Amino acid sequence: MEYSKRIQDKIVDSGKTIIQTMKLMDDGFTKSLIVFNNGRFVGIITNGDLQRAIIAKIPFDTPILKVVDNKTKRYASVTDDREKIKTWMLEKRAELMPILDEEGNLSDVIFWKDLFSDDKIEDNRKKIDLPVVIMAGGKGTRLNPLTNVIPKPLVPVGEKTILEVIMDQFEGIGCHKFYMSVNYKADMVKYYLSQLEHKYDIEFFQEDKPLGTIGSVSLLKGRITTPFFVSNCDSINEQDYRDVYDYHVSNHNDLTIVTMVKSFKIPYGVIETGEDGLMVALSEKPELTYQVNTGVYILNPSCIEEIPKGEFFHITDLMEKTKTRGGRVGCFPVSEHAWKDMGEWREYLKLIKVL
């Protein structure tokens, strides 16, 4: 059957792998694709399906046919009226809705913008009011010479600063209380925030010497009694952090790391050798996939007790300490295009060019 271009652009073959499908979603700026197998409709695959597969340690090169989960999906039939379909799409916040005929074949697809005037999918999810700790005290040396003049939190991104973009994202999901660790050019950061028309609920705390990537959080002992977010001041994610919190709670984690799925293609043939230098295997221009740390976390309040007061202590030290005592450190993956590292010149320039 011939489909319109906008439907064809959303179709992915069931033989595509998890990592290939993540890239297709990134390139198409979409979180849902329509899966076909040998010309027949199989189902919808979402970004959330791929994230759950990665969390479950399903290999990145697994075909998505093994990942499609129709038990959690709802599809419309040609006999359903538009008001019913509209209600379903609102309930699921669905980007698109397949319309199936009596034999289960794809007849049409209704997109969000076909039914709603606002292109932005309505957010009817429950808000979460968790504390947010922002690590804003670093020197931002990777952005020199700009950060010789202004601190990294105040580096502009469009009409806002990096700091405002990060805080606005958390406020958007219901978080209102911010604890901000400051050190380098602290007075400038405080003054700027005090002059904003929008007043954030911020408590500042300041280390009197460098304490590593998490050491200053020891100063918050006794002040935070619920799970809380920690964010570096250069990490912008397009991920809804409520999904991360849901995973953190359901997986009974002590600490959850938001990771980014990153692929590296080696432009050479890679040779594996054994004893006496004999070749064991050859991979021609292999693509390697890893999860890398984005600098955003959820911590249980008990983690604060693990951070030694007044000592230099990295978040990686906290991860190891938590694991050593038998705690759970989880990883929640986001796609490569979902994360922007604003602390690195190339990524920063790429973003402001888009804006």
Spans of model-derived segments:
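Bateman (tandem CBS) regulatory domains
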Residues: 1-10, 16-17, 62-73, 147-150, ...
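The conserved cystathionine-beta-synthase
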Residues: 10-29, 36-37, 54, 74-94, ...
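Short beta->alpha transition motifs characteristic of CBS
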Residues: 27, 34, 41-55, 98, ...
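Short acidic/polar active-site loop segments enriched in Thr and Asp
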Residues: 31, 95, 176, 226, ...
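Conserved N-terminal catalytic core of the sugar/cofactor nucleotidyltransferase
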Residues: 55, 160-233, 243, 273, ...
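N-terminal glycine-rich phosphate-binding loop and ensuing alpha1 helix
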Residues: 124-189, 352
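Catalytic-core segments of class I nucleotidyltransferases/pyrophosphorylases
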Residues: 228-229, 236, 242-249, 262-265, ...
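A short, conserved acidic/glycine-rich loop-to-beta-strand motif
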Residues: 251-261
